[in-house]
């Protein structure tokens, strides 16, 4: 398990005016909170935050320094601008290394591009699982190999690797569906049927025939 690193500074001023001034300096406001822990308002460099967020996601431990004070955290929530690709605010949850905690980790379907049975359609039905463990046992993901799946197969939470790990308690129902494999349905191509217009006389033609 790799701990990522991030430097922060304490933030004394709050409010929209203070936030605008931070944006000019490419700094993002955030907060560190936790159990029996006084929340700390912080600022973090946006480029460094983006880099760590891309690698750590919300399921990896991050060692942070706040004006030299060390904490271990995970990214709990990130707010981004609805139109622009920049961060607006970030929440960090402090993790106590000696205490069991709840985490959310992503589900990964290993070998999804190498499934032997082809053609086939793989449907991922669960993106994340909730687990409980000591921080030192925190995995980056919950994985299952799908290479040998057959038509009609459905993998459940109990098939994930973390479910078999004695150091981890999975909080999801063990029968919750994770993914399924099916045979692609044949597309019914409707041929364009050209309507052959019947040789039906028009009103004027009928009138002409009657006149004759």
Swiss-Prot record:
Cited Pfam families: Ribosomal_L25p, Ribosomal_TL5_C
Record's keyword annotation contains Metal-binding: no
Domain of life: Bacteria
Stretches the record annotates as Disordered: 181-212
Gene3D superfamilies, per database record: Ribosomal protein L25, beta domain, Ribosomal Protein L25, Chain P
One GO CC term on file: cytosolic large ribosomal subunit
Regions of compositional bias (Acidic residues) in chain numbering: 188-197
Keywords annotated in UniProt: Ribonucleoprotein, Ribosomal protein, RNA-binding, rRNA-binding
Bridged cysteine pairs (disulfide): none
Molecular functions (GO terms): 5S rRNA binding; structural constituent of ribosome
SUPFAM superfamilies: Ribosomal protein L25-like (SSF50715)
Example GO BP: translation
Summary of the function given for this chain in its UniProt record: This is one of the proteins that binds to the 5S RNA in the ribosome where it forms part of the central protuberance.
Annotated family: Belongs to the bacterial ribosomal protein bL25 family. CTC subfamily.
Subunit structure: Part of the 50S ribosomal subunit; part of the 5S rRNA/L5/L18/L25 subcomplex. Contacts the 5S rRNA. Binds to the 5S rRNA independently of L5 and L18.
PANTHER family in UniProt: RIBOSOMAL PROTEIN L25/GLN-TRNA SYNTHETASE, ANTI-CODON-BINDING DOMAIN-CONTAINING PROTEIN, RIBOSOMAL PROTEIN L25_GLN-TRNA SYNTHETASE, ANTI-CODON-BINDING DOMAIN-CONTAINING PROTEIN
Name of the protein described by the UniProt record: Large ribosomal subunit protein bL25
Organism: Finegoldia magna (strain ATCC 29328 / DSM 20472 / WAL 2508) (Peptostreptococcus magnus)
């Amino acid at each position: 398990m790799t701990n990522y690193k991030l430097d922060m500074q304490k933030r004394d001023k709050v409010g929209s005016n203070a936030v605008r001034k931070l944006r000019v300096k490419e700094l993002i406001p955030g907060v560190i909170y936790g159990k029996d822990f006084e929340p700390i308002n912080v600022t973090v460099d946006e480029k460094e935050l983006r880099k760590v967020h891309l690698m750590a996601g919300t399921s990896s431990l991050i060692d942070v320094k706040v004006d030299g004070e060390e904490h271990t955290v995970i990214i709990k929530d990130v707010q981004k601008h609805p139109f622009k690709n920049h961060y607006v605010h970030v929440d960090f949850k402090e993790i106590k290394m000696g205490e069991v905690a709840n985490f959310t980790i992503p589900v990964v379907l290993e070998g999804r591009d190498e499934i032997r049975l082809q053609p086939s359609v793989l449907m991922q039905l669960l993106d994340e699982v909730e687990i409980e463990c000591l921080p030192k046992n925190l995995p980056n993901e919950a994985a299952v190999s799908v290479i040998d799946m057959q038509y009609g197969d459905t993998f459940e939470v109990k098939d994930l690797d973390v479910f078999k790990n004695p150091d981890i308690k999975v909080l999801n129902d063990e029968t919750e569906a994770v993914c399924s494999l099916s045979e692609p349905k044949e597309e019914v191509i409707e041929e364009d049927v050209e309507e052959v217009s019947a040789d039906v006389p028009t009103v004027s033609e009928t009138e002409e025939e009657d006149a004759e």
